[in-house]
Curated annotation (Swiss-Prot):
Tissue and organ expression note: Ubiquitously expressed. Expressed at higher level in placenta, small intestine, fetal thymus and lymph node. Highly expressed in endothelial cells.
SUPFAM superfamilies, A to Z: Growth factor receptor domain, TSP-1 type 1 repeat
Gene that specifies this protein: RSPO3
Biased composition (Basic residues): 213-223
Name of the molecule in the record: R-spondin-3
Signal peptide (residue range): 1-21
Domain remarks: The FU repeats are required for activation and stabilization of beta-catenin.
Length: 272
């Protein structure tokens, strides 16, 4: 009877030892799969189990649940991972998941970075930016609309024509201004940055090499004093050259008649 009890006790002890070795090997496999799990309550874990990992953490560390396959295990971290925010309680410091549209957050109601397709505005993730704001597709934030800003006009340039400041009566002058702030996508466009207007060139003699083309042409066309009268025909000769031959004959006949009439009048006076 005593021998039978001893044998049963021996069998039970061996069976318990076998179960313990299986659990230990399973815990080692889980720790190899996830390096953040503290091994045997070492590192950040205050209390732990081989199956569930950390159950509580040492002071100032955050407790978080991480999924491995179909189960979750407890880990102790110095800071919460991306997509989680840390909350400190008297008995535990806990990592809590951010909202579904938030990539990183400061707390439950304040997001610091949104997921793709959303724009950040005052800690919230929005599909579209509010009125008066526009979306910045680089930072994925709602920003203020920026309008164009320009500087004051520079002084007018000297009055010139064809690059010359003399030799002409009329010319043009220009002035410019610079763009200080370029507009954003919805901002007001920039006004013109240059202006041109007509002006009067100052009366002054052109220095050598500054005379305009018209001045040089006038100088070449100007006739000499001696040949001015000979070269230019008078108005009477021009009129006579334009007359038709029949008109010339009529004028000559009229002159002859006048001469004959004068002769007759002279002869009559002598007879009396």
């Amino acid at each position: 009877m005593h021998l039978r009890l001893i044998s049963w006790l021996f069998i039970i002890l061996n069976f318990m030892e076998y179960i313990g070795s299986q659990n230990a090997s399973r815990g080692r496999r889980q720790r190899r799969m996830h390096p953040n799990v503290s091994q045997g309550c070492q590192g950040g874990c205050a209390t732990c189990s081989d199956y569930n990992g950390c159950l509580s953490c040492k002071p100032r560390l955050f407790f978080a649940l991480e999924r491995i396959g179909m189960k979750q295990i407890g880990v102790c971290l110095s800071s919460c991972p991306s997509g989680y925010y840390g909350t400190r309680y008297p008995d535990i410091n806990k990592c809590t998941k951010c909202k579904a549209d938030c990539d990183t957050c400061f707390n439950k109601n304040f997001c610091t970075k949104c997921k793709s397709g959303f724009y950040l505005h005052l800690g919230k993730c929005l599909d579209n930016c509010p009125e008066g704001l526009e979306a910045n597709n680089h930072t994925m934030e709602c920003v203020s609309i920026v309008h164009c800003e320009v500087s004051e006009w520079n002084p007018w340039s000297p009055c010139t024509k064809k690059g010359k400041t003399c030799g002409f009566k009329r010319g043009t002058e220009t002035r410019v201004r610079e763009i200080i702030q370029h507009p954003s996508a919805k901002g007001n466009l920039c006004p013109p940055t240059n202006e041109t207007r007509k002006c009067t060139v100052q009366r002054k003699k052109c220095q050598k090499g500054e005379r305009g083309k018209k001045g040089r042409e006038r100088k070449r066309k100007k006739p000499n004093k001696g040949e001015s009268k000979e070269a230019i025909p008078d108005s009477k000769s021009l009129e006579s050259s334009k007359e038709i031959p029949e008109q010339r004959e009529n004028k000559q006949q009229q002159k002859k008649r006048k001469v004959q009439d004068k002769q007759k009048s002279v002869s009559v006076s002598t007879v009396h």
